[in-house]
């Protein structure tokens, strides 16, 4: 059986987005190239870490002067994308492990997302993408530095668009309030 690898070597769009109300959101990555849209599901923390690591990698490459192309300090105005996810959102798989890389020759950032298999879910691990004993679907997206900066900006915006924090205990507030431990269980 051939395991699909969803590749977007020069995407028109690569974004993080959500479906659902705050507190019940499902997080997605979505890549689009030449009319083909690939969506994968992942955890909020994975979106947050991916955006942070992209920025860190670009900052490191920029500081070392290890790029053949200019790396912007922040997102470029012409690349800002606040549009929603392309609908319908049909996830190809749930993301377990992710990896980032920098292609020094081409000056491009490479993102790879590997499927969380049933065996991984049962063992409580995210699996090893190099383990050939398990067939894993994957998503591979190649981004310019500008596209990566925009992804990181939007990822931060999406992650922080959820529920606000309780001013007393810093736990997320549900629309109906919550039982605040610092206020001895009094609903806030």
Show which residues each predicted segment covers:
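Intrinsic, low-complexity N-terminal interaction/targeting segments
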Residues: 1-27, 73-138
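The feature marks the first
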Residues: 1-60, 64
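Short, structured motif recognition centered on aromatic/hydrophobic residues
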Residues: 25-30, 50, 54, 109-113, ...
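Charged surface patches that recognize polyanionic ligands
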Residues: 43-46, 51-97
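Non-transmembrane "mature" sequence context
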Residues: 86-87, 168-170, 182
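Mixed-charge, glycine-accented linear interaction segment located at domain edges/termini
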Residues: 117-177
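Short cysteine/histidine-rich zinc-coordinating motifs and their immediately flanking basic loops
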Residues: 178-184
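Short microdomains enriched in Cys/His and/or Lys/Arg
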Residues: 186-188
């Amino acid at each position: 059986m051939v395991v699909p690898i969803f590749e977007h070597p020069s995407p028109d769009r690569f974004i993080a987005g959500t479906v659902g109300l705050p507190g019940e959101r499902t997080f997605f990555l979505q890549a689009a190239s030449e009319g083909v849209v690939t969506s994968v599901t992942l955890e909020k923390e994975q979106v947050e870490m991916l955006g942070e690591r992209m920025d860190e990698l670009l900052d490191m490459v920029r500081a070392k002067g290890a790029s053949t192309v200019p790396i912007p300090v922040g997102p470029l105005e012409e690349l800002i994308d606040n549009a929603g996810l392309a609908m319908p959102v049909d996830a190809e798989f749930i993301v377990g492990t992710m990896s980032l890389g920098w292609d020094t020759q081409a000056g491009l950032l490479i993102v790879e997302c590997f499927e969380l298999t049933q065996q991984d879910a049962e063992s409580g691990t995210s699996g090893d993408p190099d383990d050939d004993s398990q067939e894993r679907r994957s998503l591979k997206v190649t981004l310019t530095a500008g596209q990566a900066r925009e992804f990181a900006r939007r990822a931060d915006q999406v992650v922080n668009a959820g529920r606000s924090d309780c001013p007393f205990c810093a736990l997320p507030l549900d629309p109906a309030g919550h039982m605040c431990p610092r206020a001895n269980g009094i609903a806030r």
